[in-house]
């Protein structure tokens, strides 16, 4: 089954879609000028490996303007460092990324659940008719001391309905979830036009305080087992069924 690991390649492809483009945070290749430019524009950015998974290597960078000047801070895992000037901070980040290729992306101030940020995984798979279907959705809450939500990085999976309850209710909530599923579907269709052969994708989406969804990443080898963390197993059974149809978990 085909996969595509480069976040930069996937970003460039998605930017070609009129339906998807407006949900992609501004993203550039990592260098000294691009990080500073986006920091000045947004005050908060994320630096992430071009090739990577499970939230490993993701760094949050903040710019705080004060009367005495600018202060810079970054967090990597549970550790954070502060600097009085940009050059020192950039040098430190450059050393920590171990010469790998990185991206810098506009930071999104995401919604929180119990004072912890969360994002959403939309699972989109080819079904029995070989048509794309948004087969599953789940929320992922970050560890209190971490900036990433991945289950493999101490994140906690929860029903999306639970996480959205404070912000949208009733039929409006169901309509909102349908819109998220449709966004995942549109991404799968568009990506498959440029790179035929995909059978599954996992779309990671963050929601800002105006309830706008932002596409953080499209994973072309998504882990279906996260859905087993939900008490209601119906979604998990569907996701696993489609995964097997698509060639996952074959017996050796």
Label every model-predicted segment.
Residues 42-43, 76-155:
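Phosphate-binding site of ATP-dependent enzymes
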Residues 64, 123-127, 206-210:
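Short beta-strand micro-motifs enriched in acidic
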Residues 1-8, 12, 168-171, 175-178, ...:
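C-terminal active-site "lid" helix and adjoining low-complexity regulatory extension at the edge
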Residues 96-108, 133, 145-206:
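A long amphipathic alpha-helix within ATP-dependent nucleotide-binding catalytic cores
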């Amino acid at each position: 089954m085909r996969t595509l690991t480069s976040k930069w390649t996937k970003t460039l492809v998605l930017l070609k879609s009129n339906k998807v483009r407006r949900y992609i945070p501004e993203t550039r290749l990592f260098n000294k000028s691009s990080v500073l430019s986006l920091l000045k524009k947004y005050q908060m950015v994320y630096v992430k490996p071009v090739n990577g998974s499970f939230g490993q290597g993701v760094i949050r960078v903040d710019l705080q303007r004060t009367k005495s000047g600018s202060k810079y801070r970054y967090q990597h895992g549970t550790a954070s460092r502060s600097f009085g000037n940009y050059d020192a901070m950039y040098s430190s980040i450059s050393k920590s990324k171990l010469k790998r290729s990185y991206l810098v992306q506009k930071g999104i101030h995401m919604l929180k659940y119990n004072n912890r940020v969360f994002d959403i995984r939309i699972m989109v798979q080819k079904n029995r008719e070989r048509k794309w279907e948004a087969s599953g959705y789940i929320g992922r809450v970050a560890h209190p001391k971490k900036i990433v939500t991945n289950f493999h990085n101490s994140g906690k999976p929860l029903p999306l309905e639970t996480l959205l309850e404070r912000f949208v209710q009733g039929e409006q909530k169901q309509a909102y979830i349908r819109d998220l599923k449709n966004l995942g579907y549109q991404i799968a269709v568009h990506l498959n036009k440029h790179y035929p052969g995909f059978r599954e994708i996992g779309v990671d989406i963050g929601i800002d305080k105006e309830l706008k969804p932002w596409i953080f990443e499209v994973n072309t080898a998504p882990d279906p087992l996260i859905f087993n963390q939900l008490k209601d197993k119906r979604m998990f059974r569907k996701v696993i069924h489609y995964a097997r149809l698509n060639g996952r978990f074959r017996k050796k």
